[in-house]
Amino acid sequence: MSTTVPLHASSFSSGTTGAGGGVQQALQLQHCAYHVGASVGSSGSALNNNSINVPNNNTMGMSSAGSSNGSNLVNGQQRSTRGASKQRRDQINVEIQKLRDLLPLSDLIKDRLFQLQVMSLGCIFIRKHRYQQTVLQPQLQMLQMQMSSPMPRGIDICKALRGFMLMVTRSGKILHVSDNASEYLGHSVEEIMCQGDSIYDLVDGRDHGAVQAELASGPPGAATFPEERVFICRLNLARTAKRQLQYHKFVLFQGRYIQPAEFYQQLNAQNSQPDCDQPVFSAYCQPLINPENAEGMSTGNTHVFSTQHYLDMKFKEADTMASQHLGFSKEQLKGMSWYGMIHPNHVPEIAHKHRLLCQEKEGSVLALIRLQAANGEWIWLHTVFSIRPNNELNSDGKRLRHVIHCFHQKLTDLEAATLQANSWIYSMRHTYPTVFSCQDSPPPSEEQQPSSPQTPPFTEQPPMLVEQKPLIGAGIAPGFPSLDYNQIKVEIPMRPINTQIPLFTPESSSPESSASLHTSLLPHHNAFPLDILEDILPSNDVLPELKDEVDEILRQVEQSPATSPAHSFPSNVNFGHRHSMPNAFDSAELYKYLGPALFDGNFAMQHQHHLQQQHQSQPNHPLQMTPIPPMSCPPSNYGQSNFLFHHQHLNQHLHHSQPPHPYHFDYYNRKRSWAV
């Protein structure tokens, strides 16, 4: 028998998958498999009378232990067994070739299969046929009775899913992988199944525990059936260690057992062998977009849309699906600030990652955010931010050196809660380059040049906080005069960032397994999932990256000064869900890039008019209503007295100027004003 080589996905070429195989084909597969086993364990009855029989435990027809030279002693005479072994191997090869011909695959795929792969695929198709008759057939009959019209033939219903279909037994044995899996994983179904007949052959070893825990729990009882469950795992389709890192694919599994526990108990009671038919778990698998596959997955996927933004995150372009999900036309989105749609809880993290992209002019980052559509509904998005060079000219004739491309993947509440419980995905180092270079795009002037991440943080100028514009649809109250919205600003000093702590953790430090969620955690359909899942969220701290000089790094961390803020935050400040964020930003750089995008004049004008009415009796107050420099640079004459006055009276306004029954927009604006 020819020696089998290790299985590699590169050993195959793509091809179309044939039909699933009928009853006759499955019976023929079983018949060939039986003959292969009979040939392996035979005692040489097919040989002539002069041949020497090999014991039954000699599995592959090789000579016995005492005859390594291919001979054996019978009645004192030495006879050769090489001919018997070769004939037995030829019989096995013939039966395996019959199995190969019966597989419902294309000829191009069959010709590239090794013998071990033929046996593995044969087991998968035989197991699939067996479960179709016992477990799946009653479910199909029930679905056909519920349907008013029969399902047309030749239609692939998996195209309507947000991912590919996967069916496994409770022990992890693969029953079915839908044909559209190649569109998401980049490998044909045959290549995926040839990795092994178990799901654990495809899943990364660090996630074996999470997958096993989900499958081992078994189907629920009829009282709670069905029970949807969502979990994340990493699929690793490369068998070589050198290719594992770049071929990791984060996949979001959402599925359930297709029958309650009572069904399998009754089914196994009718069989002579206990646990003959295991429960079947069916799930559709949705790969998460990443900087490598985001552009490819956005094509033809109705749950992925893309947008383009200027460096201040104002919309430049949007595709058709963006208008469909957000409720705005392309013309309405152009020029609109992206920060005006984001939930305030996500502003600190997004502002920090946005600043990194604007600083380095390269790289990509991931984020889990909520955007508000035109109808006021919040939608969860798994987003990839990438900055790319650009040669276009704007309306003023100036060249747009860089454009930020965003790819958004829409999620359900349960999927978003699962990703929130696995927030380490959004702080992995592979989502952002470890080596930076800013030589490809010099800024037009030195005044607007962002500093390097190694630049010491500012200690004299605290970060600027300006009032955020109101929620979509909230206009200016009648009677307010048109004033310059750049006149009122609030400064809050914060602790400088520690440059010794890495911004993103390396991929190798990711957890050994992922967290999962069930529908039982969401008792109400409209309940906010993260409000009841705070106890399972991981720590927000980021551990330093320890290299060779461990003692030196620890000594630098211990000696780094930790300056306490000069003024405490108001009681209504909410800094939840910060996702391992640093505690401070560089004020000047943050204000340069986020000032024009974050803040609009409407809401600030309301606060300015309110403060003018309250303090008309104080003409000698230090606050002077004079124009200030443009939004691209912070005010130069903004002193400590201005901060004390604005901090005090803005607090009074936020605490005492609320209506008896606060409206949703007021709550949003109060949180937005302090979000950064």
Curated annotation (Swiss-Prot):
Its main location: nucleus. It is found in: Nucleus. InterPro entries: bHLH_dom, bHLH_NPAS4, HLH_DNA-bd_sf, PAS, PAS-like_dom_sf. GO terms for molecular function: DNA-binding transcription factor activity, RNA polymerase II-specific; protein dimerization activity; RNA polymerase II transcription regulatory region sequence-specific DNA binding. Residues 73-84 have a biased composition (Polar residues). CDD domains: bHLH-PAS_NPAS4_PASD10, PAS. It comes from the Eukaryota. Residues 76-129 form the bHLH domain. GO terms for biological process: positive regulation of transcription by RNA polymerase II; regulation of transcription by RNA polymerase II. Residues 165-215 form the PAS domain. Gene3D superfamilies: PAS domain (3.30.450.20). Transmembrane segments: none annotated. GO terms for cellular component: nucleus; RNA polymerase II transcription regulator complex. Keywords: DNA-binding, Nucleus, Transcription, Transcription regulation. Residues 90-129 are annotated as: Helix-loop-helix motif. Heterodimer; efficient DNA binding requires dimerization with another bHLH protein. Forms a heterodimer with ARNT homolog aha-1; binds DNA as heterodimer. Transcription factor. Efficient DNA binding requires dimerization with another bHLH protein, such as ARNT homolog aha-1. Regulates transcription of target genes, probably acting in complex with aha-1. This is PAS domain-containing protein cky-1. The lineage of its organism: Eukaryota, Metazoa, Ecdysozoa, Nematoda, Chromadorea.
